[in-house]
């Protein structure tokens, strides 16, 4: 299984058409499945996650002795350094469908799967598997609860889990 970008999320980064060509080359090498994602963490971190970074929480969790200067910068200009990307469920689906049309190999959809209905939509669009992130961080029993037809994650995409992850 290989994880690859559908686009990088900034002007000079790879765009969809280029990433489709990369994926087609990967497919030629007999990879079992491809996980489709997007974003370049150091330049466009919230392309891959959506929502806003909780700047105060991020600064709070940073080591005050090692990163004092970064904590100070975050508190004053963090909102400019890490712009908010509005969250919507299945946020990569439209782009991922372009890859589905261009590739024959199994594809793993990732991006805003917050309930059973989202997973079923991705599977109905031709994706072979779904990958779930935030919803599992919020509730480790999420997959079992998805057996209920209308179950939806309680995750509000506050991204406090991301702030903590970046500071460990």
Each language-model region and where it sits:
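Flavin-dependent oxidoreductase catalytic cores
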Residues: 1-168
């Amino acid at each position: 299984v290989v994880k690859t970008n559908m686009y990088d999320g900034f002007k000079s980064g790879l765009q969809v058409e280029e990433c489709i060509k990369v994926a087609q080359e990967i497919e030629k090498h007999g990879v079992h499945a491809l996980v489709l994602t997007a974003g370049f963490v150091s330049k466009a971190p919230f392309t891959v996650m959506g929502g806003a970074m909780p700047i105060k929480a991020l600064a709070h969790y940073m080591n005050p002795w090692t990163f004092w200067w970064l904590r100070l910068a975050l508190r004053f200009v963090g909102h400019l350094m890490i712009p908010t990307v509005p969250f919507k469920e299945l946020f990569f689906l439209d782009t991922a469908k372009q890859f589905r049309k261009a590739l024959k190999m199994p594809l793993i959809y990732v991006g805003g799967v917050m309930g059973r209905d989202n997973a079923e939509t991705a599977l109905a669009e031709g994706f072979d598997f779904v990958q779930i992130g935030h919803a599992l961080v919020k509730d480790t029993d999420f997959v079992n609860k998805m057996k209920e037809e209308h179950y939806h994650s309680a995750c509000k995409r506050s991204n406090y889990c991301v702030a903590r992850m970046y500071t460990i």
